[in-house]
Amino acid sequence: MVHGAADISMREFDPRRFGDYATKDWQVIKAKEDYCLRHEIPFPHFNRLAGRPIKPSPLYDRLKDAGAVFEEVYGHERPRWFARDGVAQQDHYSFCRNEVHVMVGTEVAAVRNNVGTMDITAFTKVEVTGTGSAEALQRLVANRLPRKDGGVILTHLLNRRGRIEIEVTVIRLAGDRYYLVCAAFFEQRLLDHLANHGGDGLTVINRSTGWAALALQGPKSRAVLAEVTDAPLDNAGFRWLSARQIGIAGHDVWALRMSYAGELGWELHGPAENMLAVYDALWAAGEAHGIANYGSFAMNAMRMEKGFKGAGELTNEVTLPEADVMRFVNLETGDFIGRDETIASQQAAEAGTMPWICAYLAIDADGKADGHGGEAVMHDGRVVGSTSSVAYGHSVGKVLAFAYIKPEAAAPGTALEVVVMNEARKSVVLGEAAWDPQNLLPRTDG
C-alpha cells in the first residue's frame, strides 16, 4: 500500500471515492443518515437519499418527470430505471425479483428492438493535451493509442505490479489532444494517475462536471440521429469505433460511435448547457421510432448479455490475463507501466499456474431470484471461485454472470453450480457472448 498498489481492492476505503462535493455540511447530513440506517436490512442496490441531489445533470428534471428513479454515483444523479404502468416511482427493495425486473426488461426490449437514450453524464470525462501527450499516454496504457484523429480504443491503466487500476476509453480528438472516459468513481484516481505518471508535458482538463453525455443506442439509432444532424452516419462516413464533431439542435457535440449495449449506437458528449436541447431534439425525432429512456439497470443487463466486463471484474487484485482482457492489449507499444508483469502473468496462464481467471457463465433461472455477485461457484462438489457480477439477460432468457474461478474449471462448456440464496443452480461456462456473439450489430451499415 505504501507504494500505491495494495494487494487487495481498497475501493470501499479509498478517500478518493468522494469528490469535492463532499463538503462539511454534506458529511454531517450523511453521518446522521448512517446512524439512522444502522439497523436497516442491507438490501441489494440500497439507495441512500440524504443530501441529494448534489450534482444533477442538465437532464435531471426532464428525466424525473419521465419516471426516473435515480442513484448517486460520485455525487452525480444517474437514472437506474424508469417507472411506468402504475409502478411507484421509488426504490422497491428485495433480494428477489419484483416489479423493477419487469420495468428493466421493458427498457432492454426498447433498446434491442427500437432505440433508447440514457443519461451517461456521470462518466468521468478528462481531456489531455500538450506536446508529447501521445508519448506520455502511451507509457500509461496497455493498448496502442489511436493513430488517426477520431480514433477510439478501449484500454487499461496498470500499477507497477501489473494489476488493473482503471479501464478507460481513449479518443484522439485532434493531434496531441485526447479525451479519456471512464467510470464515475474513478475520477480522482484517473487524475492522480495522470499527475503521478504522466510527466510534466501533460495539460489535464477535467470535463466531468462541465460536460454532459448521452447514449443513443438501438437498431433505429441511425434513423433518429439522421433527422437531427447533417453529418454522414453510414459506415463509409462514420465507421465503428470512431469519433467526430457533429451539429445537433444548433450545438456541436462529439459523437462517439461505440456501444456498451452491444447495438448500433453513439455516445454524444459536449458542454452541459447544451445537452438538454440535444436530448429534446433526439426525442422529438425519435418518437416515431419508439424511442425510450433506459437506466443503469438495463445497461448492466445488456453489457452482461454482450459479455462486457465492468468494475466488478476489473480491480487492482487481478492482471489483464486473469481478467481475460488481453484482446485489448498491445505488448509491442513499448515499456508501459506493468508490461513486464503482464507478460509474466501471460506466461503463468500458458503454464497453467495462474491462480484464477474471469469466466463468463450462464446460470439456470428459477424466475424468482437471480443473484447479485459474491455467490459461490462449485465444480464437482468443491468451491472453485465466486461471482463478481450477475444479471438477468432479458434478451436471451438466461441469468448471466462473471466469476473468478480456478482455470481448470473455466473451459467453455464446463458444467458448474452457482449457489444463489442457498440453492445450488446448474451453470455452464460460455465461450462467447450470449447476445450477438459475432458483434455484427454495432457495425450495421445504413
Task: Enumerate the predicted regions with their spans.
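Polyanion-binding and phosphate-handling cores
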Residues: 1, 11-13
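Conserved, structured C-terminal
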Residues: 3-8, 42-72, 78-80, 84-86, ...
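Acidic, proline/glycine-enriched N-terminal capping motif
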Residues: 13-158, 163-165
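A short acidic-Thr-Gly-centered motif at the start of a beta-strand
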Residues: 107, 170-171
